[in-house]
Amino acid sequence: MKIKALAKLKPEVGIWMTTVDKPEPGHNDLLIKIHKTAICGTDIHIYNWDEWSQNTIPVPMVVGHEYVGEVVGMGQEVRGFSVGDRVSGEGHITCGHCRNCRAGRTHLCRNTIGVGVNRTGAFAEYLVIPAFNAFKIPAGISDDLASIFDPFGNAVHSALSFDVVGEDVLITGAGPIGIMAAAVAKHAGARYVVITDINEYRLDLARKMGVTRAVNVAQQKLEDVIAQLGMTEGFDVGLEMSGAPVAFNSMLKNMSHGGKIALLGIPPSDMSIDWNMVIFKGLVIKGIYGREMFETWYKMASLIQSGLDLDPIITHTFPVDKFQEGFDMMRSGKSGKVILDWSI
């Protein structure tokens, strides 16, 4: 049986609609009928066929890793799931036998394989993944929200890496993950949550999500905002989401002594920073990759169930046959999360 899929078919700019064989689940796998998928920044890198993509993505391959769907089949060894379960899933498939996996730190597996990056992805009518990677979506959480659990998980992992209760938090980079991280920090009890960017559309989205201040650093100095808020010692927690050297250096400059930074944005490999600030301020910098399995996933569901409203971050939905419009919208920078509906 042939099914529809979006794939990287050629080593050039673009994503293409194609048909592929319907996948068959192995002994420990789930077969998921995809309802909705979301376009990730990684998918845009793949679309643009940048240097990272050229060195990483096998061609041809079905891409995509943000999704929600319904279990329609499973392998004979699977336990804990039933046909009809609504699921999303962890996009990092881990080996299970390295030291970190065996110690319960699976998000630090050195042999991680990415769904839609190193193996067949979720931009298709059906997806097969290991049952271990699937997460049941609680009733009351919409398909739209469930489809963005992967990037929401990056935001939660970053925002909750350090204690933010009563603290002042700076987020550099108002992409969807940065905006969601800001909302999580505010929901979790931070005092001031300030986010910076140069994209006014996304700064407006951040304002809708309840940040204290959304600062266009092309028009306003972060130091002026700090003074207006009456802050005297800098930010306690920093979440670097942009990968922009100028943003990270600004963060270092405006951190309090003893401040803690979660680093999710991927900077150029030759980025230069003032290490004197790190040393003499006693700053802590923690690299963030993916989501903690599966602590972050349970926190995601609980945050939404406790009233965290992520609806404003989803700005556009397209039927999958209009996927090109969705990718164009994401590439324009004039969107939050863009969803492709496979049920239409």
UniProtKB/Swiss-Prot annotation:
One of its GO terms (molecular function) is zinc ion binding. It catalyses: L-threonine + NAD(+) = (2S)-2-amino-3-oxobutanoate + NADH + H(+). The active site is at 42 (charge relay system), 45 (charge relay system). NAD(+) binds at residues 177, 197, 202, 264-266, 288-289. GO terms for biological process: L-threonine catabolic process to glycine. Its main location: cytoplasm. Pathway: Amino-acid degradation; L-threonine degradation via oxydo-reductase pathway; glycine from L-threonine: step 1/2. Its cofactor is Zn(2+). It is found in: Cytoplasm. Belongs to the zinc-containing alcohol dehydrogenase family. This is L-threonine 3-dehydrogenase.
